[in-house]
Amino acid sequence: MVSKLSQLQTELLAALLESGLSKEALIQALGEPGPYLMVGEGPLDKGESCGGSRGDLTELPNGLGETRGSEDDTDDDGEDFAPPILKELENLSPEEAAHQKAVVESLLQEDPWRVAKMVKSYLQQHNIPQREVVDTTGLNQSHLSQHLNKGTPMKTQKRAALYTWYVRKQREVAQQFTHAGQGGLIEEPTGDELPTKKGRRNRFKWGPASQQILFQAYERQKNPSKEERETLVEECNRAECIQRGVSPSQAQGLGSNLVTEVRVYNWFANRRKEEAFRHKLAMDTYNGPPPGPGPGPALPAHSSPGLPTTTLSPSKVHGVRYGQSATSEAAEVPSSSGGPLVTVSAALHQVSPTGLEPSSLLSTEAKLVSATGGPLPPVSTLTALHSLEQTSPGLNQQPQNLIMASLPGVMTIGPGEPASLGPTFTNTGASTLVIGLASTQAQSVPVINSMGSSLTTLQPVQFSQPLHPSYQQPLMPPVQSHVAQSPFMATMAQLQSPHALYSHKPEVAQYTHTSLLPQTMLITDTNLSTLASLTPTKQVFTSDTEASSEPGLHEPPSPATTIHIPSQDPSNIQHLQPAHRLSTSPTVSSSSLVLYQSSDSNGHSHLLPSNHSVIETFISTQMASSSQ
């Protein structure tokens, strides 16, 4: 005996005294054995003897009162949970109720995890879903699943409800197989069958034994005949009976799990559909997306993978205009030298100024850019127009070889379009000029003019910005082709870098978002192979000239800067002058001259004078430039 009370015992005594119970009554109650010790069939814990609901345990016919002393049964809903299946035992005969109570009591005395595995095995053997257990016992679906699969602890009263259902289900199944065709109907009017009728009927579920037979038959014949299906029905029912431990002659006792010919037919139909779907999915995965037209090289890794490519004829390329929405098209461009075709991927989207770096000039990703008005987006890659078919009326006499390098803006002037450009530009020759214009400042466009297969000189042509929007209506899109790595391409990359030729000029502006490329290179030639051996022999960079005038006044051209280039032939020396500006807005212009000399000196017999020259049609009264 403990001579001193603990703190908990002291608090309990104080609570009893505060409830109105006198000390004499408390001592008398402790001295006399009260009826609270006689509840149920065994002694209970003294700590729970004061509960007011102990009298309810005497009404339970399964004798579960002795197990109510567990601590987990006094949780939140432990006192409120009353499984309906336990109340239904009162409707059974006394012998049947006593038998089920004895079996449930024995199961409660065993290890809960071992009994849970036994119940789970029984459910799998007879293809009984857990939903049926939940509908009958009132247990929580998640709690029941965790208890059967993981051994999660469950309160004694809930386990008693589960074990009661388990014992009753065993009796029902035994009666079904014993009375094959009618045993299941004998027990339906009884009270213990009422909860099962309220729930949904069990769905048919194929057992593992039947599935093994059907899959083996499917390998032999994917669409069996009616006779073959009936044979499979007998085999499946026999296997299900053997799985349940009963004779195959008692197949009618399977109840809702009985295999029929219709169910076998549906199973084969579903398997055929699944196989066809898997085959189609595998073929789609194997084939992948359809390849693009043309045997040209694949797009590099830096190409936009999200842009689909479609076939676009060269005649349709001329009609493409720059829009707000980004699209992508591919054009089949025939080579002017009769070589293989190359596929040009054209993306209609604006290019950031970072794409104007010299390192990206040789990129094979083409940008098809045009506009219906306003400033044009920059073009960051080399663009080839010489290989396009001359199907457009405005470009029916375009020179064959024309390469445009890093144009911040593109403007096309054709023989049939002088009216749209007004009197400022006239083109009476047989050629077409494609030039690049910046969006904020005037440009001095050096044009390399040639005749035959020789490259002669670089002619600066001066323009100013901004032009009137109507001047940009006939703009045509420059299309870039896949250009192979060559010395000429490397030379072009050097031309676009301001530090390559004009490294001694510290005032050269860097590439910025507001000021794009200061110059645009235009090369015309009939044979690109002669351009591969070009080497710069002399470079002259003239100082920038700035001029400003008020609106409405025409300012005369600034004094010309004469540049003499030594050459073997005096006729090769060009006298260059800046041309008239096209508008009176303040402009900043710069002109430069670079002479390229081919390794073959025999091909330099003539210079600018050319009947089909690009420059000849523009060096007119509107542009003051002379040649000697």
Swiss-Prot record:
Keyword vocabulary terms for this entry: Activator, DNA-binding, Homeobox, Isopeptide bond, Nucleus, Phosphoprotein, Transcription, Transcription regulation, Ubl conjugation
Residues covered by the HNF-p1 domain: 1-32
KW Ubl conjugation (keyword) present: yes
Polar residues bias: start-end ranges: 324-338, 560-575
Annotated localization: Nucleus
Residues covered by region (Dimerization): 1-31
UniProt cross-link Glycyl lysine isopeptide (Lys-Gly) (interchain with G-Cter in ubiquitin), position: 117
Oligomer status and interactors: Binds DNA as a dimer. Heterotetramer with PCBD1; formed by a dimer of dimers. Interacts with PCBD1. Interacts with BHLHE41. Interacts with NR5A2. Interacts with SPOP; this interaction promotes ubiquitination and degradation of HNF1A.
Function per UniProt: Transcriptional activator that regulates the tissue specific expression of multiple genes, especially in pancreatic islet cells and in liver. Binds to the inverted palindrome 5'-GTTAATNATTAAC-3'. Activates the transcription of CYP1A2, CYP2E1 and CYP3A11.
Protein name according to UniProt: Hepatocyte nuclear factor 1-alpha
Upper taxonomic lineage: Eukaryota, Metazoa, Chordata, Craniata, Vertebrata
